[in-house]
Amino acid sequence: MGKTSQRKGADGERELSGLLQQHGFDIQRGGSLSFGTVPDLVGLPGIHIEVKRVERLNVGEAMAQAIRDAEKFHDGAPTLFHRRNRQPWLVTMRLEDWLELYNEK
């Protein structure tokens, strides 16, 4: 992964972390140079947060990474938070996980 890509990823993590903190969530960054040793962000109970801040995203590959990491860290439903330049943040998760979360409410 190139330095520009790493920087953009770290910027995306900081941006999303700040937005979630503004909404009252106690979000902490795992560190952009952790290379999978810790989650991108932590602080949403029952949700594994995978952050992607790219122009061209392969959602299938990104979700596969989120699923692998959620199983590795045992921290919740694999959830992909992603955004392109000048676009709003989007959240992608498996329907079965969303239904489980929604039915708990």
Predicted regions and their residues:
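Catalytic phosphate/metal-binding cores of nucleic-acid and nucleotide-processing enzymes, i.e., regions
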Residues: 1-105
